[in-house]
């Protein structure tokens, strides 16, 4: 008698994805972050659903409804802070996941990589519209500043901004539609995640050695289910430490002041996970140029498979590229720091240098390092 999970039409799909999936025997803990992102997405959808039951998307009551959730709803404070800090954990896992993809050359699985870029963009969009919903000062002004960037588009810009706002300023219509977007986008993300997995399972996972692992595969369950479970426990532990001890450490104090169109906060800035892109945007004096740089800061990831000319897969045996990679990571951290600083000397100059370096490493320095390393290989043999 055949096992049901191998014959049942629905269970068969789950079986081929999570149970009998042939997996390289040597993938390290850096490969745990895919499953952690799945857990984060589930946490966000569940907590978000319960928040939506009590939230009202009206400018008069939005701020009060969030306060009501925290004060009057059973464990409302827990759900709210799990959702807010869950987003931060989501982005930490996302950045590590992308970083691992760059380090180990996983971008050569180009369909999976490109769907991943779409996922990153969609997640950032979801986080942005979600940040507007509590209708605090930073919510309102963040929405005003970021949506206003679209006015830089020639000819149709102003019309486009007013169309998104649903009026002549960020107001009730904007909040209502942002709530609608914030509700639907996670389900679109879930659909893209399934496509991401579909493409991944067409080729199989990459592995730290960068070699073909077809000759040495093991079933996903029980080996990697147990391994992923450790990651999940650690993730939940860090999340709960954040939620229960430091719930506001990653937030902005300005968001505890209700939105006031007549009073601009001293420093308008988005959540920490969008700061690197915000720093790149601010470092260009021209408005349209800044918007293009902002979009390119994410889309540049699509250039990795195109610019790669290395004879080796991944950076594990490539010291020059490795050095550049860690400079790139440090540069990203500097950009994140600069994005949260006021627009004044010396922060502006540091931001401009870091922005130039961000693009230069990917477009100029990495390909050049590839060529040098290929030549060193020729000398060796």
Curated annotation (Swiss-Prot):
Entry binding sites for a ubiquinone: 201
Highest classification ranks of the organism: Eukaryota, Metazoa, Chordata, Craniata, Vertebrata
Annotated transmembrane regions: 33-53, 77-98, 113-133, 178-198, 226-246, 288-308, 320-340, 347-367
Main location group: mitochondrion
Protein's UniProt name: Cytochrome b
Function, as annotated: Component of the ubiquinol-cytochrome c reductase complex (complex III or cytochrome b-c1 complex) that is part of the mitochondrial respiratory chain. The b-c1 complex mediates electron transfer from ubiquinol to cytochrome c. Contributes to the generation of a proton gradient across the mitochondrial membrane that is then used for ATP synthesis.
Record's GO cellular component terms: mitochondrial inner membrane; respiratory chain complex III
Binding-site residues for heme b b566, renumbered to this chain: 97, 196
Family: Belongs to the cytochrome b family.
Gene3D superfamilies in alphabetical order: Cytochrome Bc1 Complex, Chain C
Binding residues for heme b b562: 83, 182
CDD domains, sorted: cytochrome_b_C, Cytochrome_b_N
Species in which this protein is naturally found: Abrothrix longipilis (Long-haired grass mouse)
Cofactor(s) named in the record: heme b
InterPro entries linked: Cyt_b/b6_C (IPR005798), Cyt_b/b6_C_sf (IPR036150), Cyt_b/b6_N (IPR005797), Cytb/b6-like_sf (IPR027387), Cytochrome_b (IPR030689), Cytochrome_b_C_euk/bac (IPR048260), Cytochrome_b_N_euk/bac (IPR048259), Di-haem_cyt_TM (IPR016174)
Extra remark: Heme 1 (or BL or b562) is low-potential and absorbs at about 562 nm, and heme 2 (or BH or b566) is high-potential and absorbs at about 566 nm.
Subunit structure: The cytochrome bc1 complex contains 11 subunits: 3 respiratory subunits (MT-CYB, CYC1 and UQCRFS1), 2 core proteins (UQCRC1 and UQCRC2) and 6 low-molecular weight proteins (UQCRH/QCR6, UQCRB/QCR7, UQCRQ/QCR8, UQCR10/QCR9, UQCR11/QCR10 and a cleavage product of UQCRFS1). This cytochrome bc1 complex then forms a dimer.
Single GO molecular function: metal ion binding
GO BP, one annotated term: mitochondrial electron transport, ubiquinol to cytochrome c
């Amino acid at each position: 008698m055949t096992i049901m999970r191998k014959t049942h039409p629905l269970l068969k799909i789950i079986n081929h994805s999570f149970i009998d999936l042939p997996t390289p025997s040597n993938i390290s803990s850096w490969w745990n972050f895919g499953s952690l992102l799945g857990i984060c997405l589930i946490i966000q959808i569940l907590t978000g659903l319960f928040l939506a039951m009590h939230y009202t998307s009206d400018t008069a009551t939005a701020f009060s409804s969030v306060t009501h959730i925290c004060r009057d709803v059973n464990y409302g404070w827990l759900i709210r802070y799990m959702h807010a800090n869950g987003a931060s954990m989501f982005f930490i896992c996302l950045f590590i996941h992308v970083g691992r993809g760059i380090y180990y050359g996983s971008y050569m699985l180009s369909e999976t990589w490109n769907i991943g870029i779409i996922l990153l963009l969609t997640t950032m969009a979801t986080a942005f519209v979600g940040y507007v919903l509590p209708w605090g000062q930073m919510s309102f002004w963040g929405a005003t500043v970021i949506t206003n960037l679209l006015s830089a588009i020639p000819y149709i810009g102003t019309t486009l901004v007013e169309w998104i706002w649903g009026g002549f300023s960020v107001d009730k219509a904007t909040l209502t539609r942002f709530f609608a977007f914030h509700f639907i986008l996670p389900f679109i993300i879930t659909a893209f995640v399934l496509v991401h997995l579909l493409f991944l399972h067409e080729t199989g996972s990459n592995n730290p050695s960068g070699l073909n692992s077809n000759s040495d595969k093991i079933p996903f369950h029980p080996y990697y289910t147990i391994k992923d479970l450790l990651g999940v426990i650690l993730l939940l532990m860090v999340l709960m430490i954040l939620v229960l001890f430091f719930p506001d450490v990653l937030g902005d104090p300005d968001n505890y002041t209700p939105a006031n169109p007549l009073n601009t906060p001293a420093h308008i800035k988005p959540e920490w996970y969008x700061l690197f892109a915000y720093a790149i945007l601010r470092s260009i004096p021209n408005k349209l140029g800044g918007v293009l740089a902002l979009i390119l800061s994410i889309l540049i990831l699509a250039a990795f498979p195109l610019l790669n000319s290395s004879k080796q897969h991944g950076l594990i045996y490539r010291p020059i590229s490795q050095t550049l990679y860690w400079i790139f990571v440090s540069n990203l951290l500097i950009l994140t720091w600069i994005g949260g600083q006021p627009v004044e000397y010396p922060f502006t100059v540091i931001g401009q240098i870091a922005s130039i370096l961000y693009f230069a490493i990917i477009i100029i320095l990495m390909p050049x390092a590839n060529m040098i390393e290929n030549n060193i290989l020729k000398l060796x043999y």
